Amino acid sequence: GAPVRVLHLGAGALTLPRYLQATRPGSEQTVVDLDRELVSFVLAELPLPAGTDLVSVVADARLAAVDLALDGERFDAVVLDIGTGEEGAEHLRGAVFYGELLELLTAGGVLLVNIGDDAGLHFLGAELGALEEAAAEAGVPGPWTLADQGMLERLDWGNVVLAAGAPLGEAGCTERLAAAGPHPAAVLDPAESAALAARIRRA
């Protein structure tokens, strides 16, 4: 695929940057993480593929996002993958923060938010509402919900990816996302995501 500009908020094992370098060589990637030792350890133990264009920033994700916006930086994708759930940092959630991240997108950009939650998915329900509010304010479609189908049917614990951005409203996008997995995959459009949030509130 063609190179893209991606902002990763949360480094982890740098798995996604490696994948992007393999599938979209030449992509410009910025990784922000507060844990300097984690990033250094990962790079020492698992060096990035040759040619990877990656800038590592040690900073709070929200402060870094604000600085990038002030500098006029824009990205084709912003990926928020920081420990979430009820115990996560409160300033890295909610409609205002998601709105700040949406402002960092190019016209064709997409925001992806990885959410881990306990059984009942009450945190997910709250964040669905928050991202819906932020997307409406920014004038972009969202949120879409991507997860294991059984998990959402049972309101079971696990990980969910929420997405918002102009390209998601294009014809055939839901089908392409479902084909990508996990299988069986649930890909909920904004109306279906709102219905899921309502079901969580009633449970």
Labelled PLM ranges:
Residues 1-107, 121-122, 155:
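The AdoMet/dcAdoMet-binding core of the Class I SAM-like
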Residues 10, 49, 53, 67, ...:
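Serine/threonine-rich low-complexity intrinsically disordered regions
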Residues 26, 51-53, 108, 139-140, ...:
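A generic structural signal for alpha->beta connector loops
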Residues 38-40, 60-63, 108-112, 144-146, ...:
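Short C-terminal domain-edge/linker segments immediately following a structured domain
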Residues 66, 70, 136, 182, ...:
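Generic surface-pattern signal
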Residues 89, 95-168:
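C-terminal substrate-binding/active-site "lid" region of AdoMet-derived donor-dependent transferases
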Residues 152-203:
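SAM/dcSAM-binding transferase cores
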